[in-house]
A protein has these predicted regions:
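A structural-propensity feature for long, helix-poor, extended segments
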Residues: 6-44, 48, 148, 158, ...
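Alpha-helix capping and helix-loop boundary segments enriched in small/acidic/polar residues
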Residues: 28-31, 35, 102-106, 126, ...
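Ferredoxin-type iron-sulfur electron-transfer modules and their immediate structural context
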Residues: 131, 135, 144-301, 309-517, ...
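Glycine-rich ThDP/TPP pyrophosphate-binding loop and its adjacent helix/strand module
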Residues: 496-498, 512-520, 527-543, 548-678
């Protein structure tokens, strides 16, 4: 008999999962987690520094560690505390380099089968030969339809899993120092109190030990922003290394990074002196005259997807993937640069080009999203453009899980203390939640307007203040001007002392024009939250809505939504979707006063940048629908090429880029612009064949798949031709 319980965090990449397994000759009735295990396995070496991995292990127990290092270096890298426990409890200690084995046999970073085999080799719950036979039988069943090559690779994983190495546990380890002094741990004095006392404890899976008193002052559920920067999980086996001699300074690597772990920095001579000896090159552009340029990677925040390397357009790649071990010094460079070098967004127009946009600080960083996530680059760029004044209502789904799961908060603030204010609502009412935020903000800004009008006649307010009041009243909806008024006016409010200035100071956060955003996936926007979304855009309120379209319910495991196209396999559509994809964007255009756009950052990042600029500037509801390649698609070329997959989707006509701008109609122009080129329809079938969600249907039901795939292509052509007709209309007739 066997029993299994699982505890896990919400990270979608490199997340913590603890499997509690029991085996016995009799029925097991233990409705609680294992607290005193006989066997412990740690599949990620870095977890040894993050969690109490050996907690509760029984004397004479067994410990298996997946280590990328030699036996000698493995021992050297273990903390004294771990070695002391191994010695005191006489633990049998084994290692295996499952990471290297997986790479060698073609499984990439998939180590689970190797480590499962290693478990059966040393745990001896059943004879190892029997376990090997059973595992290979399960492989045939699970992967048989995916081809002989996949089966052979997993067979090899099982065979290689038996190659464990036993490490001698020395008696002198029991005398190791565990005092917690500097010889045992890195200096933590620079970590904020909230991080040390709450975030670190929860991330170490010890959150249940926190008393209620630890949350004093946070009774309303508000948490500080930017906590993800302190995690430094180090989950990637390989990370990008920058080669300055090949770099053309396009900043595309920074644009596509799902986790904001690679960024361009421009150094003044003073800043260069502060950071010491690092490799830089002359910065391009007259704005950066006399300055130096560098692309910096944060290896401990990178998930190792490789999209940055894939999009690098240099003839000889300026980035290559290297082992994490070889890039550990870059972690110090990252910390040094981010502390001493400013972002140069004030020297360029960040909305002018993709390159310029990346000189702005991302205010969404180091989330728990999947490696290679196709969603997060969209959000990250929005925060770079508007993050200082953003308010976000986030629907439940992938974007809320990686966007704000306690205690990890990837939305952060800049050196001025400004950044997005973020909140998560229910699946079904997020649009209304965002509308409520926008309405409340508008009402508060109406109060600011009333106060400033009264201030113009106030005898207490100075002439300088009155000039600022008038400037604000003339430019209430201008972000740049209202920010200038804020910076000049707020320091003077406490000096005046009149009731008007006191009330203005109490509500100063509403002086600057806010950028209200509503985020969610296609399961929310097309399905469950569609009624609310329709209500919000019909209201005419000045809100910006981003629907991240993965064409399935990604967070809950890939169920079909109304965004799922014909022929795609998804849960609840196991034999292929039979109904064509809902055209949410076209539905929204029927109102006539809603800004609508369909984008793919992998296909045309400049178009997406233009859409963001237009949507934010439009005084009314804006809806942006973004194509996001997802792990649920089963992309054959891998999640390291999600940007390439988005590009291919547009090239073959699977996805189309367009904008509907009501402002153009007011000028007598056609509001509809078709931004993508004529598709190469000959590539359509090859594109869908490159994703398991389509390809697996062909293997299971070849004749039915052929009919559905043909219908999918015809639907795409029909949709494209309808867009073409709209784009060619003479709006004056």
């Amino acid at each position: 008999y066997c029993q299994a319980y699982f505890s896990y965090d919400s990270k979608k990449s490199g997340g913590f999962t603890c499997s509690h397994l029991r085996f016995g000759d009799n029925v097991i009735r233990s409705p609680y987690l294992v607290t005193t295990p006989d066997f412990v396995a740690c599949h990620v070496f870095n977890y040894m520094n993050m969690y109490e991995v050996l907690k509760g292990i029984k004397p004479n127990g067994t410990f298996l560690l997946n280590s990328m290092f030699s036996p000698e270096e493995t021992v050297e890298r273990l903390s004294s505390k771990v070695k002391k426990e191994l010695a005191e409890k006489n633990i049998s200690f084994y290692i295996i380099n499952a990471t290297k084995i997986a790479e060698e046999i073609g499984l990439g970073n998939r180590t689970n089968t190797i480590l499962q085999s290693a478990f059966f080799k040393i745990a001896e719950v059943i004879p190892y030969e029997l376990a090997v036979k059973a595992m290979k039988k399960a492989i045939d069943k699970s992967y048989g339809k995916k081809g002989e090559n996949i089966v052979k690779m997993n067979y090899a994983a099982v065979d290689k899993g038996g190659e464990v190495i036993k490490i001698e546990v020395k008696k002198e380890w029991a005398e190791a120092c565990t005092c917690g002094c500097s010889c045992q741990s890195e200096q933590t004095s620079d970590r904020p109190e909230f991080i040390r006392n709450i975030v670190d404890v929860i991330n170490a899976q010890e959150g249940d030990s926190l008393p209620v008193s630890a949350f004093k002052g946070m009774e309303n559920g508000t948490f500080p922003a930017g906590t993800s920067q302190y995690e430094k999980r180090g989950i990637a086996s390989h990370v990008p290394a920058w080669h300055s001699e090949n770099c053309i300074q396009c900043n595309k690597c920074s644009l596509v990074c799902p986790h904001a772990a690679i960024r361009p920095f421009v150094f003044t001579q003073d800043e260069l002196a502060k950071v010491g000896e690092i490799t830089t090159i002359k910065a391009q552009g007259k704005e950066f005259d006399g300055m130096q340029f560098r692309v910096q990677v944060s290896p401990l925040d990178c998930t190792g997807c490789g999209n940055c390397v894939d999009v690098c357009p240099a003839k000889t790649k300026a980035l290559t993937m290297e082992s994490l071990i070889s890039q550990t010094d870059e972690a110090k460079n990252w910390e040094n640069i981010t502390k001493n070098v400013s972002y140069k967004s004030d020297l360029v127009d960040i909305t002018k080009s993709v390159k310029n946009s990346q000189f702005a600080q991302p205010l969404f960083e180091f989330s728990g999203a999947c490696a290679g996530c196709g969603e997060t680059p969209y959000i990250k760029l929005i925060t770079q453009l508007f993050g200082e004044r953003m308010i976000v209502a986030n629907a439940t789904g992938c974007s809320s899980i990686y966007g704000g799961s306690c205690p990890s908060m990837p939305y952060t603030k800049n050196a001025k203390g400004r950044g997005p204010a973020w909140a998560n609502s229910l699946f079904e009412d997020n649009a209304e939640f965002g509308l409520g935020m926008a309405t409340a903000t508008r009402k508060m800004r109406d109060r600011i307007e009333r106060l400033m009008k009264e201030g113009l006649a106030c005898t207490c307010c100075s002439d300088e203040q009155k000039a600022l009041f008038q400037m604000w009243l003339d430019n209430r909806e201008c972000p740049e001007t209202t920010q200038k008024v804020y910076d000049a006016l707020v320091p003077t409010l406490s000096q005046c002392g009149c009731d008007i200035c006191k009330e203005l100071e109490a509500n100063k956060q509403f002086i600057v024009k806010k950028s209200q955003w509503i985020f969610g996936g296609d399961g929310w926007g097309y399905d469950i939250g569609y009624g609310g979304l329709d209500h919000v855009i019909a209201s005419g309120e000045d809100v910006n809505i981003l629907v991240i379209d993965t064409e399935v319910y990604s967070n809950t495991g890939g169920q079909a939504s109304k965004a799922t196209p014909v022929g795609a396999i998804a849960k609840f559509a196991a034999s292929g979707k039979r109904i064509r994809k809902k055209d949410l964007g076209m539905i929204a255009t029927t109102y006539g006063y809603v800004y609508v756009a369909q984008v793919s950052i992998g296909a045309d990042p400049a178009q997406y940048l233009k859409v963001l600029k237009e949507a934010e500037a439009y005084h009314g509801p804006s809806l942006i629908i973004a194509y996001a390649p997802c792990i649920n698609h089963g992309i054959k070329i891998g999640m390291g090429k999600t940007q390439e997959e988005g590009k291919r989707a547009v090239e073959c006509g699977y996805w189309h880029l367009w904008r509907y701008n009501p402002s153009l109609a007011a000028e007598g122009k056609n509001p509809f612009s078709l931004d993508s080129k004529e598709p190469d329809w000959s590539k359509f079938q090859a594109f869908i064949d490159g994703e398991v969600r389509y390809n697996s249907l062909k293997k299971a039901f070849p004749e039915e798949a052929a009919a559905l795939f043909s219908a999918a292509e015809e639907n795409a052509k029909w949709r494209y031709n309808s867009y073409k007709r709209m784009a060619s209309m003479d709006w004056n007739k």
